[in-house]
Amino acid sequence: MKKILLLTTLLVLILVSGYAQTDRFWSANFQSRSSITTDKAVSRQSYPTDIKLFRLNFLPFQQVLFSVVGKQAANKSAIISIPNAAGMLEEFTVVEASNFEAALQEKFPDIRSFSGKGITDKSATLKLSISPQGVQTMVFRSGADDEFIEPYSKDHTIYSVYKSHREKGKLPWNCTTEDQKISIALSEKMGTLQLAARSGGDVKTMRLAQSVTAEYSNYFGATSASQVSLVLAAINNTLTRCNGVYEKDLALHLNLVAASTNVIYYNPATDPYSAAATGAGGAWNRELQNTLT
């Protein structure tokens, strides 16, 4: 009986350690989801149901990443681990890949972006953004769904890992174009674009002026210019993911210009943009042009 019990215990330990690995950065979270106060992004309609939860030891993770930033760290790389959608930890070699032009990056040194190449999975590439508000990642895999990590708990200590697919019907609209048809059409067009974009060799960098509505700023907790870092952290998260796609498909990288902070707004009553219901109908196009020119 003792041998059977011992064998059962060992099997359980092996299964748990294999399914939910732990290192100095990440540990599997076994806390009941119902007991976690979640980040408001978790309530969005498109939020996935099939997720894995991990707790992040933020400061050591940040320290390793920040060891490869700045002029003194030029051409240096670091090795980090992140969890995947299967609940396993993977290693990546990472380098800094800033989305801010130099003057803006110098002013906000705690908001950073990184690119990584898979060690565990050689086909995987990583885009990672980090700020005092937490970490977000996007992983591209050959022949598999993209994967994401983003804060799950309100205090941004617990993170969710999930694949890019979603359940149909979760959003008020669905794409009805057949996957095979759209895949073939896009592949033909993208092949031409990629050849043209990459004919010059290296990834091209373009300067981006970005303006946001007051509602956008307010959503991320910023109600005045003194809290602009909250907005820039959110913009950096989005740019990191967008640049991951642009770099892969178009050999193009966007850098946010420092003057963008002059066209970030905080008061919905005085910003130059229409309410969402009107703006999304086309009004924002003209309003944005007037703001940036």
For the regions a protein language model found, what residue spans apply to each?
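Bacterial Sec-dependent N-terminal signal peptides
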Residues: M1-F25
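A broadly conserved detector of short glycine/acidic/proline-rich loop/turn motifs that flank catalytic sites
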Residues: L10-L11, T120, R141, V212
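N-terminal regions of proteins, emphasizing targeting and processing segments when present
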Residues: V16-G18, R55, H165
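Fold-level signature of zinc-dependent metallopeptidase catalytic domains
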Residues: Q21-D39, S43, I51, T157-T293
